[in-house]
Amino acid sequence: MTLEAIRYSTGKLVIIDQLQLPYVEKYIEVPTSKDAWHAIKKMRVRGAPAIAIVAALALASELHTLMAHDKLSNRAEEVRLFIQEKLDYLVSSRPTAVNLSDAARKLAAHVSDHAEMPNSTGRAVAEAFIQAAEEMLAKDLKDNTNIGKYGAEWIIRNALAGGRSKATILTHCNTGSLATSGYGTALGVIRALASKNALAYAYCTETRPYNQGSRLTAYELVHENLPATLVTDSMVAALLAKAEAAVDAIVVGADRVAANGDTANKIGTYALAVLAKFHGVKFLVAAPLTTIDRSTKSGADIVIEERPASEVTTIKGAVETESSCDRIKLETVRIAAEGIHVWNPAFDVTPSALIDAIITERGVVERGTDGRYNFDGIFEDHSAF
């Protein structure tokens, strides 16, 4: 059974607290945009698609509560301004992930259209927002399934060597059910391969310093009983050089893809792409169209979020003794010398020249004969939500 990171019914949003994983599966309510901002900032929820959905649904829940208690203005323009203010606030929680700003822009335009309608009311504007946010949730799940399908098909056609019928895949960070509405992007490709009986093995990186790979991706792989092994980030070169490992492709997600294909993703992705190029391993990015930002010309224009030094100098985990592992008692311990300076960018940018293909819900985009990515065709008739 696939994990549920997001549980939603109209007026109530609940998310799994990813800071407690993999030790405790605890769900917390996110009733307001303020709660969503803190959940995103503290990384109780993470993954570009997931944070956009949580932000939208938290504001939808807040609007529903205000209407239920008759605390929402009946003036359409006042409600529109209220929504815009909340969306701007939510976007500030994680600036690198384009899905959040893209969703905010589309939702703001949607409610503006409704606010400008003749005889529009505050309730009508709020209800339009709620409906659009709920549609985002459903669409993301459908899109992820398609990403998995197209990615698996591409790998079977292009990445398998020696007549083999099953692929060995390495992935980075967490891009599964915990990072999306469900199924996942890069991890969704692994799921799709498994569903086709075309997955030989999966490797996931630890993903320092926040350990999303060891805490979350490994948790999902174990939860679904998929054949997998955890490696530290620094072991990947040795793994790719190991003939018996026979890694066919590295598949990663993305927080922002620029118009030229340069991709911002979890720190360490760039290094994986360089290693893949050297070892002749296919390097693929799996991301929905909402992650592709055609207004950003190249990776040089992407703002990279920097995280607190404590994420590098300390580590949190369950207390383990020789006889047992206490899954409830979590402790934070220091692992670096006090006084050392820390640089902790959350993301890096992989140049498009190192990326073999970008997998979307509309299909797989490869570089053209000029060696460049062009997304124009795949964006034709792309709807707002």
UniProtKB/Swiss-Prot annotation:
Coiled-coil intervals: none
GO CC terms: cytoplasm; nucleus
Entry keywords, A to Z: Amino-acid biosynthesis, Cytoplasm, Isomerase, Methionine biosynthesis, Nucleus
Catalytic activity: 5-(methylsulfanyl)-alpha-D-ribose 1-phosphate = 5-(methylsulfanyl)-D-ribulose 1-phosphate
Broad enzyme group: isomerase
Catalytic site positions: 255 (proton donor)
Site (Transition state stabilizer): 173
Domain of life: Eukaryota
Biological process per Gene Ontology, one example term: L-methionine salvage from methylthioadenosine
Pfam family, one: IF-2B
Protein name: Methylthioribose-1-phosphate isomerase
